[in-house]
Design a protein with these regions (language model features):
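P-loop NTPase motor module signature
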Residues: 1-289
Length: 289
């Protein structure tokens, strides 16, 4: 019996994360009853069936994971292997990326390329609802899957997450609210806290909560993205997690300054809206370049 119990214990990692705690409790009860001399044959049979069912569900999700492709023109693509290695080898990674680097849309795909997202969701937070919806739409398009399928989002008054969902976009407020009913956040295998430099009250609460949760969830990966504003502070908060810096993609910008009125113009002839229209018309006539 002890050999069977140990074998079942080892199989827990073959199950989805959200099933492991309940199955572990049932296994612990069976072990306690066996030590007390009570019959456990029926309990072990039921546990074996439950483990088989959960393991099959995980196997099917893993086989159905989308295969991502990457745009080599994005700056983050040059760092893809380093980012993947850091995620694989560390529980917490801080990614410092400028606007236009591609970090928001490519990070979930890098996680998918590592096989993450089968045992639990890849949760991806955004500070605002419109950003959560638009990022979900973009990632779904890049993966070639309909929105609400393998890529979904959940914001206030709108829930497009289904049983097939692998990547879940949401506001940081939604994730914070979920800690009330899912204190160990067991539906997630990866959490990406995007735009953490904004330091809203929700983000600060989440970072504090996750700091305490991670030791109890060694199977949870945490990725924090920040602009180039003191990323070392986030690293220190999470026990000196590795920091990876990614440059942004920039374009030349020409700045032109002009007075509202030229010296020879009458003040009554042109107000601010008209001056703006004249400036736009001038740029339009000149064309791109």
């Amino acid at each position: 019996v002890e050999t069977t119990l140990n074998s079942l214990q080892n199989r827990l990692l073959e199950c989805p994360i959200r099933d492991r705690a309940a199955l572990a409790r049932r296994l612990q009860n069976a072990r306690r009853r066996w030590r007390e001399g009570q019959p456990v044959d029926r309990s072990l049979e039921q546990l074996t069936v439950a483990l088989d069912t959960a393991a099959l569900r995980l196997s099917e999700r893993r086989a159905a994971l989308p295969v991502p492709t990457f745009d080599d023109d994005l700056p983050i693509s040059a760092h893809r292997e380093a980012i993947a290695a850091a995620i694989r080898d560390h529980q917490v990674v801080v990614l410092c990326g400028e606007t236009g680097s591609g970090k928001t849309t490519q990070l979930p795909k890098i996680c998918l390329s590592l096989g993450l997202g089968a045992a639990g969701l890849i949760g991806h937070t955004q500070p605002r609802r419109i950003a959560a919806r638009s990022v979900a739409t973009r990632i779904a398009a890049e993966l070639g899957t309909p929105l609400g399928g393998q890529v979904g989002y959940k914001v206030r008054f709108s829930d497009r997450v289904g049983p097939e969902t692998v990547v879940k976009l949401m506001t940081d407020g939604i994730l914070l609210a979920e800690t009330q009913s899912d204190r160990r956040l067991e539906q997630y295998e990866v959490l990406i806290i995007d735009e953490a430099h904004e330091r809203s009250l929700n983000i600060d609460f989440l970072l504090g909560y996750l700091k305490r949760l991670l030791p109890r969830r060694p199977d949870l990966k945490l990725i924090i993205t920040s602009a180039t504003i003191d990323p070392e502070r986030f690293s220190r908060h999470f026990d000196h997690a590795p920091v990876i810096e990614v440059s942004g993609r920039t374009y030349p910008v020409e700045l032109r300054y002009r007075p509202l009125l030229a010296a020879e113009e009458d003040e009554r002839d042109r107000d601010l809206p008209q001056a703006i229209l004249d400036a736009v018309d001038e740029v339009w006539r000149q064309g791109p370049g």
